[in-house]
Every structure is written in C-alpha cells, then in structure tokens.
C-alpha cells in the first residue's frame, strides 16, 4: 500500500480543493492510503484509507520559508514532511508555499547523498500533447555545469519510469542551437553533457522551440528556468485574454465565440500544465511534489496521481542507485 502525506492547508483554495482532490483519488485508486495533516475540525472525509493527523499551525504564503520550517514545528507541511523522513509515508504533496516546501525537503527530509544541489522540475505542455520536463525552475538561482548534468540524469530516470519514455532526449536551454553559443555556464555544461554516456543529449534548444517539443527534458539554472516558466505562463494567459476580448467585441464575434466555445476550452486545458501534475523536487531522500497554488480539485488529483506513479516505480531508490552509484 502506498502511503501519501498531504498538507491539508496548502494552496489558495485549501482545504476544500485538497479534500475534493483526495476524495477523487481514493475513489479512483485502491492501493493508496492518505495521511492528512491539518486541523481535524476542517476535515470532512471519513474513509478507511485516510488517517487524520491533527496539527495546530499553518505555513502561509507570506512566511519566510526557512524560518517558518524551523519555528513552526507543528505546521501541517512540516509534520507531513517529517512523516516521510521517518519512513511513515512514501511521499508528501502540498500546494502551499513553494520555498517552504523546498526547505522542508532539504532540512526535514534531507538530501540524497551525492546530490550537490536539488532541482525543481515540472512537466509543461507542448503542441503535440507529449509535454516536456523543465528543470531547474528555481530551487537554485545559480548552478555549476556539474549540477546541470545531475539534473539531466535525475530527470532522465524520472521520465523513463514515470512517463514511459524509453530513451528520453535532453536539451540544454540556450540562446542558439550552435555548440559554442551561450555564456560560460552554457558552454561548459554543453561539453559535459556531450561527454555523458548515460543520457541522450541532443544539444542546445532555444526557448522559442520549447512548445514545439524540442526535447523530452530541458535543463538550465534555476534563475533562467523560472523566467522561462513565468514567460510561458504569462504569454498563454494574455493570449487567452486577448482572444476573449476580440471574441466579445461585437455581435458577429460573439456568435463565432459561441460556436467554438468547446474547442477554445479544450485548447485552454491543453495549455494548462496542472494537467500533468505538480512539480517534483529532485535530489531529496523522498518524493516531494508541489501542486500549483491555485489548483482546482482535478489539478490536485493529478498531483496525487503523479505521486502514486513515482512511488510505484520506486523512483527515489533508482535515483540513489543510478545517480550516486550506491
């Protein structure tokens, strides 16, 4: 039985969407147990495979991450992370404060021996519906070439086991596709990735090609990765806003909007990265998944489903074995 620790109070719409997502998840899968951490008075789920763990504190979006983890010992997120550290559960998922969850992963659960820097990875949509994994998205603003090689190794294992890609391709985010393009970090990383035989490195990829499925995995430093993510997210949101404004501009366009409303919703859902689950924190000694802060129940369900798959494939053991050669 897979045991998943859930922070009941993480996210903009907690605890309602968290509980709704859990109910969907327990109904869909019978090989999982949920360990719910939060205020027991706010839990409305009575299920034989759900265990409630009462906590008295909450980490908010405004809290300073490391300070909150160290001072709020009875916070739902901290207690959930501790359960993974103590091997009482297999994974933790939260839609709460991203920095705090990363801090909980590092300082409560702990880093895998041999991993120098953790990385936050998220699967983003592509035009062909396959999606690609981007990392690092902000766990570390600065990185060395060796760190990016480790990112590529971890993501390759994950893509193979979780997404069923037999030989996932790895691209390096850069300002051009030529071998010598980019700053010193990009050039040095390119050379190391090219020499690494355990991954399928295909070279540099430009940001304009990402949504066209340039690679299964794209690695970069956390500063650049976060900029790419925010740019893609903002561009998609603004395109839909402009499209909506155009379609509501006149009677003629309103009629057209009514005719293609279903198709537009399908397109919007296609570009919603929460359809792929949450972001995974690579490099810590346990499965840590960050659901989107504004998740609805389906997005939280997808994050739980992602956790289940990672636990079923024993991803952490594989990372230890293949990345650190333990």
Swiss-Prot record:
Highest taxon of source: Bacteria
GO BP annotations, alphabetical order: fatty acid biosynthetic process; phospholipid biosynthetic process
Localization annotation: Cytoplasm
GO MF entry, a single one: phosphate:acyl-[acyl carrier protein] acyltransferase activity
Family of the protein in this entry: Belongs to the PlsX family.
NCBIfam families: plsX
Subunit structure and binding partners: Homodimer. Probably interacts with PlsY.
UniProt name for this protein: Phosphate acyltransferase
Annotated source species: Macrococcus caseolyticus (strain JCSC5402) (Macrococcoides caseolyticum)
Lineage of producing organism: Bacteria, Bacillati, Bacillota, Bacilli, Bacillales
